[in-house]
A protein has these predicted regions:
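Active-site neighborhoods and metal-handling regions in enzymes and metal-associated proteins
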Residues: 1-426
């Protein structure tokens, strides 16, 4: 293998920890994908999206991972060699991140696209693998579908991948629990520096310092275009009533028009609600939590609104806990919010209202299913979801949010839950 020598000790996490995805995880994921491909009637798939390369191959190097369906051409069941990673750069890092000598798949240099289909054919592949048409840019997908046309037409495998990633493994949940521990320290930092006269951006900076020191890489991954999100939304008073381009309850002013959401230069004023919505990622895995702060005392009208949103949250949790559909949780949550007089302010102000009460999280912030109309299925076992009913008025916003998971016993919070108060006073 050509190129500079790779010292594995240079690629460790804090205090010498090995932060690679365990080989056993990669092996199980690839096997499960092969099974799901067969069930979907697809001969195989070419994984090219960076997030999914990390999920299946252990790293997001520039390349692609071919995974054949169970029993299909190229699979070990059919006499082939099984999954193979084709890497442009960095090949050495790809080998290391996949487990080195223990990697569950072969890793080799990416051939010229002119001969790519032939290289797959040499591995026993007789049909064009599916591509991630729902994830990668159209021009990129077209280039590969044309290169593979000698094997036939490529189908879309996006849904198969998304469906598999909905249920998290024990290891993934442990990553999210680790993230939640860091997140508590982020809220503690906001509590320590906050008060009347402190800017929203200064509050974000305090939380950001904790998150960065614990390994946050600076990017919150999104599934929906334009793939942009501010990982810390802190809005005080009237800033909380400003809508933005982002499909969420709370917009925020932001520092300038290109970053027109989240924290801006507004300063905390006495007795005004300050909403703090913080995300932390541990080894790529997202947890999302919102709490309220106030310098002085929270006005009674805002206290009542918060109590109502906590009641809506409890309804949503109860429905999902029973294993009923996410759409049912939306219907019942919306019905209670409407009954309590919040129809025009739930998850934003008309006409800029978001139509959901919870969103799944994982390696991306906006995964499925969602507590919204049309998601006529339960939250899956192993699913992880941020549940976040909020109300927005011109003078501010209020609500709560925790990230939950569902197991055989029902829902349980991964983030603080009742361990951090709904309102913290400076």
């Amino acid at each position: 293998m050509e190129g500079p020598a790779l010292n594995a000790e240079d690629l460790l996490g804090p205090d010498g920890e090995d932060w690679r995805v365990p080989v056993s995880e990669l092996e199980h994921r690839q096997g499960e994908l092969a099974h799901r491909l067969r069930e979907a009637g697809l001969p195989g798939i070419l994984i090219q999206h960076p997030i999914d390369l990390y999920y299946y191959a252990g790293g997001r190097q520039n390349g692609a991972l071919f995974v054949p369906a169970e029993g299909a051409g190229g699979s070990k069941d059919a006499g082939g060699d099984g999954p193979v990673g084709y890497v442009r750069r960095s090949l050495r890092r790809a080998v290391h991140e996949a487990g080195g000598d223990d990697a569950p798949h072969e890793i080799t240099a990416f051939p010229s696209l002119r001969v790519f289909a032939e290289r797959l054919r040499e591995r026993g592949v007789s049909e064009a693998p599916a591509l991630q048409f729902g994830e990668v840019p159209s021009s990129f997908a077209t280039r590969f579908s044309q290169a593979l046309s000698g094997l036939g037409a490529s189908s879309d495998g996006t849904g198969v991948v998304h469906a598999q990633r909905e249920s998290k493994s024990t290891w993934e949940l442990a990553c999210m629990e680790e993230a939640a521990g860091v997140q508590i320290r982020m809220f503690e930092a906001v509590e320590a520096v906050g008060g009347e006269g402190v800017s929203e951006l200064d509050l974000v900076a305090a939380a950001e310092a904790v998150s960065r020191s614990e390994g946050f890489a600076g990017q919150v991954e999104m599934r929906r275009y334009p793939l942009q999100c501010d990982r810390a939304v802190v809005v005080s008073g009237r800033s909380g009533g400003v809508s933005s381009f982002f499909d969420s309850a709370v917009g925020g002013v932001g520092p300038h028009p290109l970053s027109g959401m989240g924290a801006g230069f507004a300063k905390v004023k006495a007795n005004e609600p300050v909403l703090v919505d913080l995300v932390h990622l541990h080894r790529g895995y997202v947890v999302d939590m919102t709490r309220m702060f106030v310098a002085g005392s929270m006005p009674k009208v805002w206290e009542e609104r918060l109590e109502d949103m906590i009641a809506v949250k409890e309804v949503v949790v109860d429905v999902l806990d029973r294993g009923e559909h996410c759409s049912k949780a939306w219907e019942e949550g919306l019905a209670l919010a409407t009954e309590l007089g919040h129809a025009d302010h739930l998850m934003g102000m008309a006409p800029d209202q978001s139509r959901f009460l919870g969103h799944s999280v994982g390696l991306q912030l906006d995964e499925a299913p969602v507590v919204a109309k049309g998601f006529d299925r339960p939250m899956p076992l192993g699913g992880t979801m941020a549940i976040e009913p909020k109300v927005v008025h011109q003078e501010g916003c209020i609500g709560s949010e925790d990230t939950w998971t569902r197991d055989e016993d029902g829902l349980r919070p991964l983030t603080a839950g009742g361990a951090w108060p709904w309102v913290t006073t400076w």
